[in-house]
From Swiss-Prot:
Disordered: annotated segments: 1-21
Protein name: Magnesium-chelatase 38 kDa subunit
Organism of origin: Chlorobaculum tepidum (strain ATCC 49652 / DSM 12025 / NBRC 103806 / TLS) (Chlorobium tepidum)
Keyword Ligase: yes
Family matches, as Pfam families: AAA_lid_2, Mg_chelatase
Enzyme class label: ligase
SUPFAM superfamilies: P-loop containing nucleoside triphosphate hydrolases
Keywords: ATP-binding, Bacteriochlorophyll biosynthesis, Chlorophyll biosynthesis, Ligase, Nucleotide-binding, Photosynthesis
Gene that produces this protein: bchI
Role description: Involved in bacteriochlorophyll biosynthesis; introduces a magnesium ion into protoporphyrin IX to yield Mg-protoporphyrin IX.
């Protein structure tokens, strides 16, 4: 009987121990699930190298800043050697961009006006008052479009089964929805699939994304600044897409020893302690952000005389630029650059600084031409300015 009691006691003890272990295991699993569901803490590796700490490449940085000041410029194409900071610079944008207002929780980043226009259209519902719509401030989205992305990933998908069974348009937004009112970045854009290029061209022209599946149609705003980067040695960009970029920035490997040493030191310091490095440059980051906001506020007050506009038209005509995107882009970019410089009036000094960015990718290609595109633009600018001075 004693043996039986001992056996029962042992069995009970074993069960209790097993139950305790199981309880510990379940608790650990529940804890793990809870931790996964919580927003992950910002890891050191998630921090992007700060914009203001990037050495050199002023042309690329200016192009991006001008597009922040006036998104109507039409984006930036950055072409240059590998490892020159193209992707790093674009991804650093997020930290210096001003916050923008949107309807709270809106997947399309819509303004109150866009929300009211879309939600009330054709529904016969009572008018929505702007003061009834809750808003929030968010960072300007900077979205990556990977080369291997499918059309559904880019444009979004419609759940046909749910739409047919419940009558609800179940739409899963794509990258175009996420990038509305922000930046859409394509690394190695010259290697992008032709079909996706066609999609981007259509959306860039209309400012809207339309997804149609089995007779069901969804449309939403998709206005974004298109930023592409690539290495010209890996392939040319399709002319149709090339012309859609407002500015074209060229970057090369820095050949100044002191600057190269500085780049290595800054990068090592950032990699060792990203948070400390970000604190170190926070004042410069804030200073840049304030200057961008000031330029955005000044932009509507910037004016341009007809004489300057005439010189811009002459420049584009003398260079044989096809169409009128050249004049439009120079005009918008010159206004943005004047605002960036704190000036309320555009002069040919401003035009001279940004003409190469606006026109070099629009010049007709001549295989026998030995003159660099930048030199050609500078030469024609000198002629136009000389004629203007002579006329004066």
């Amino acid at each position: 009987m004693t043996q039986t009691a001992n056996a029962a006691k042992k069995t009970t003890s074993t069960k209790a121990s097993a139950a305790k272990e199981a309880k510990v295991k379940v608790t650990a699993e529940e804890k793990a699930v809870t931790e996964v569901k919580k927003p992950a803490a910002k890891k050191k590796s998630a921090l992007a190298f700060p914009f203001t700490a990037i050495v050199g490449q002023e042309e690329m940085k200016l192009s991006l800043i001008l597009n922040i000041i006036d998104p109507r410029i039409g984006g930036v194409l950055v072409m240059g050697h590998r490892g020159t900071g193209k992707s790093t610079t674009v991804r650093a944008l997020a930290e210096v961009l001003p916050l923008i207002p949107r309807v709270k929780g809106d997947i399309y980043n819509r303004t109150v006006e866009q929300y009211i226009e879309m939600e009330a259209a054709g529904k016969g519902a009572p008018a929505i008052k702007p003061e009834d719509v809750e808003t929030e401030l968010i960072p300007v989205p900077v979205v990556d479009l990977p080369l291997g992305a499918t059309e559904d990933r880019v444009c979004g998908t419609i759940d046909i089964e749910k739409a047919l069974t419940s009558g609800v348009k179940a739409f899963e937004p794509g990258l175009l929805a996420q990038s509305n009112r922000g930046f859409l970045y394509i690394d190695e854009v010259n290697l992008l699939d032709d079909h996706l290029v066609d999609v981007l061209l259509d959306v860039a022209a209309s400012g809207k994304n339309v997804v149609e599946r089995e007779g069901i149609s969804i449309r939403h705003p998709a206005r974004f600044v298109l930023v592409g980067s690539g290495n010209p040695e890996e392939g040319e960009l399709r002319p149709q897409l090339l012309d859609r970029f407002g500015l074209h920035a060229r970057i090369t490997t820095i050949n100044d020893v002191a600057k190269r040493v500085q780049i290595v030191k800054l990068r090592r310091e950032f990699d060792e302690d990203p948070e400390a490095f970000m604190k170190k440059v926070s004042r410069e980051q804030q200073k840049l952000r304030k200057k961008i906001v000031a330029a955005q506020q000044l932009l509507p007050q910037v004016t341009m005389d007809d004489a300057v506009l005439t010189d811009i038209a002459k420049l584009c005509m003398n260079l044989g630029i096809d169409g009128h995107r050249g004049e439009l882009t120079i005009t918008r970019t010159a206004h943005a650059y004047a605002a960036w410089e704190g000036d309320k009036k555009v002069t040919m000094k401003h035009v001279r600084e940004i003409a190469g960015l606006c026109l070099r990718h629009r010049l007709r290609k001549d295989p026998l031409e030995t003159v660099d595109a930048g030199e050609k633009i500078d030469r024609e600018l000198a002629k136009v300015l000389g004629e203007a001075e002579a006329a004066a």
